[in-house]
From Swiss-Prot:
InterPro entries on file: NA-bd_OB-fold (IPR012340), Rib_uL2_dom2 (IPR014722), Ribosomal_uL2 (IPR002171), Ribosomal_uL2_bac/org-type (IPR005880), Ribosomal_uL2_C (IPR022669), Ribosomal_uL2_CS (IPR022671), Ribosomal_uL2_dom3 (IPR014726), Ribosomal_uL2_RNA-bd_dom (IPR022666)
Family under the similarity heading: Belongs to the universal ribosomal protein uL2 family.
Protein name in UniProt: Large ribosomal subunit protein uL2
Gene3D superfamilies reported in the protein's UniProt record: 2.30.30.30, Nucleic acid-binding proteins, Ribosomal protein L2, domain 3
Oligomer status and interactors: Part of the 50S ribosomal subunit. Forms a bridge to the 30S subunit in the 70S ribosome.
Keyword terms of this UniProt record: Ribonucleoprotein, Ribosomal protein, RNA-binding, rRNA-binding
Function: One of the primary rRNA binding proteins. Required for association of the 30S and 50S subunits to form the 70S ribosome, for tRNA binding and peptide bond formation. It has been suggested to have peptidyltransferase activity; this is somewhat controversial. Makes several contacts with the 16S rRNA in the 70S ribosome.
HAMAP family xref list: Ribosomal_uL2_B
GO terms for MF: rRNA binding; structural constituent of ribosome; transferase activity
Length: 273
């Protein structure tokens, strides 16, 4: 993938960049693997805002992705690499020998026509999926399960990868993109390789409207609100807030830890950061 720059024909175009989409081979998705997405505008069933800064955006069709990779020992061929509006990574359409077709997250350096397989003793090759117990220490992996058979939940964004660091008893130690070191049950499945589209992080949006196309609404700073709307609001002229930075509900922010204790904390070997 490469980054395309535009001539500065307008202020919004001046610093705007986008993908060249050279790795995408078709713009026609597999109809049998499409679903609908209903927009909520960030509201729940009472009509109250539960997710701020959400609303609008271009209409999308959902692509059903095979995160479980439970189709064991059936070889499949990469039929196409496609754009998915619902995620930063590209997706690959896999055509299996029994005739079934499924989408998977497209790994880096996987091309149309290559064969992949999911199984206990699959080759150590990008796109193949297998339990952590059969993956060599030091391998780069993505789409990692946290519970056996639940499907991959970790490391699915464009350009990300984890590294299998060690195996001890029933658990494998995996270094996540955040830097966190985590123990994961050794029978959980993962996919070999790095997620593709690793230039995604270098894309410059360029203008506010392009963010609105993505379904994101503006974020208003607390210090420019009125006192009724935010703890840091009010004051004559441009005031600095008068208190430590906080959320609209008074919870400290900008570095304050808000993560609650969980029963799964025991699986974290080393915190991120």
């Amino acid at each position: 993938m490469a980054i395309r720059k535009y001539k500065p024909t307008s202020p919004g175009r001046r610093y705007q960049t986008c993908s060249t989409f050279e790795e995408v081979t078709t713009d026609q998705p597999q109809k049998s693997l499409l679903g609908t997405i209903k927009k909520t505008g960030g509201r729940n069933n009472f009509g109250r805002i539960t997710s701020r800064h959400v609303g609008g955006g271009h209409k999308r069709r959902y692509r059903f992705i095979d995160f479980k990779r439970e189709k064991l020992d059936v070889p499949g061929k990469i039929a196409s690499i496609e754009y998915d509006p619902n995620r930063s990574a590209r997706i690959a359409l896999v055509s299996y020998e029994d005739g079934e077709k499924r989408y998977i997250i497209a790994p880096a350096k996987v091309a149309v026509g290559e064969k992949i397989v999911s199984g206990e003793r699959a080759d150590i090759k990008a796109g193949n999926a297998m339990p952590l117990r059969n993956i060599p220490v030091g391998s780069l992996i993505h789409n990692i399960e946290l519970k056996v058979g639940k499907g991959g939940q970790l490391i699915r964004s464009a350009g990300t990868y984890g590294q299998l660091m060690a195996k001890e008893g029933s658990y494998a130690q995996v270094r996540l993109p955040s830097g966190e070191m985590r123990k994961i049950f050794i029978d959980c499945r993962a996919t070999i390789g790095q997620v593709g589209n690793n230039e995604h992080e270098n894309i410059s949006v360029g203008k506010a409207g392009r963010t609105r196309w993505a379904g994101k609404r503006p974020k208003v700073r607390g210090v420019v609100m009125n006192p009724v709307d935010h703890p840091m609001g009010g004051g004559e002229g441009r005031s600095s807030g008068g208190r430590h930075p906080c959320t609209p509900w008074g919870v400290p922010t900008k570095g304050h830890k808000t993560r609650s204790n969980k029963s799964t904390d025991k699986y974290i070997v080393k915190r991120r950061g």
